């Protein structure tokens, strides 16, 4: 493959944009690439770069494109909106339609407020929890990523792990002192922290996907529900990734556990910028202009994102078998990946839930938290990534992210993916002398 146009664009970009990208993981630095690939179009399960290289895509815009790229039902609806205008700074029926659909489907949400990003949604949900409880402290889990607001950018996952750190400069000690962190999955330590009844909220990814995918034990989430209820602490499920992907009603439907507040993003915008936070009416009615918890946004409830999200979720609702089909595709890949790993004596642990999975290059049986994830052999991951990319398969450029499948991925594309994974594992096995 030739990458000249992408390399030239990157050289230009680094003179104009910090690091040449608008989100750090996109720079491809952790996988030892000279430049990232610059994308010009997508269709179905495939994308094409500026050098006209074709790829089977397992990033899917980091999760929103559960139907695949450029799905006709979504594009058709978006075109209708664009013909009338892009944004008005005033309400439209489309945001009401989307809100009604979300409230109808997501178990915990009685009222919802739309935002323009997942970061904005989690930041606002934490503010709301503090106002409702009249407490300042919050509890999050190591390796879970909830966007880049100051209070939540502590022992975080996603791009921070990719860059080799877990916190950010520029966050004051005053902010940091109110953010408590614990290892994911340790309910006894949660009980110890919450017993003083001075923590406003516990925020958690019900399926962590930003330290690589972690397979959640239902008992841990049930434990969080019980201890937060007992201590008057707000339980926030960050379902920006899992919402409408693990099941139509998200992880809370999948596990049968109802939080107090939920944050959403990605799929609810159908590939356009969006976020949302919602929950119990008595809590949500503290949000301005009803209450004094302020949230606003020039593009909140944007008609294009609202209509794209409505079209996507409506399609999912009308075709409930999609979730079973996606899980079957994922399991087909995983079963064969594990066979190939044994064939070439490559140490891996493959975690999956629904249509998400991560191949951890580790010499342990199970990856269950950040400490386990950090044992990954990132050199082996780099070989895996580069072999895939150079043979027409694009995956997240980080050991600490999840692969995403869409309904557009075909058996033929899955089999081609396995052929290239075999190439990668063979290289890794030869390097290790096995």
Swiss-Prot record:
GO terms under cellular component: cytoplasm
Subcellular location: Cytoplasm
Known pathway: Porphyrin-containing compound metabolism; protoporphyrin-IX biosynthesis; 5-aminolevulinate from L-glutamyl-tRNA(Glu): step 2/2
Catalytically driven reaction(s): (S)-4-amino-5-oxopentanoate = 5-aminolevulinate
Requisite cofactors: pyridoxal 5'-phosphate
Swiss-Prot/TrEMBL GO biological process terms: protoporphyrinogen IX biosynthetic process
EC number(s) given by UniProt: 5.4.3.8
Modified positions (N6-(pyridoxal phosphate)lysine) in chain numbering: 266
Keywords, ordered alphabetically: Cytoplasm, Isomerase, Porphyrin biosynthesis, Pyridoxal phosphate
GO molecular-function terms, A-Z: glutamate-1-semialdehyde 2,1-aminomutase activity; pyridoxal phosphate binding; transaminase activity
Principal cellular location given in the protein's record: cytoplasm
A Pfam family hit: Aminotran_3
Matching PANTHER family: GLUTAMATE-1-SEMIALDEHYDE 2,1-AMINOMUTASE, GLUTAMATE-1-SEMIALDEHYDE 2,1-AMINOMUTASE 1, CHLOROPLASTIC-RELATED
Quaternary data: Homodimer.
Family: Belongs to the class-III pyridoxal-phosphate-dependent aminotransferase family. HemL subfamily.
HAMAP family linked: HemL_aminotrans_3
Protein name: Glutamate-1-semialdehyde 2,1-aminomutase
Source organism per UniProt: Fusobacterium nucleatum subsp. nucleatum (strain ATCC 25586 / DSM 15643 / BCRC 10681 / CIP 101130 / JCM 8532 / KCTC 2640 / LMG 13131 / VPI 4355)
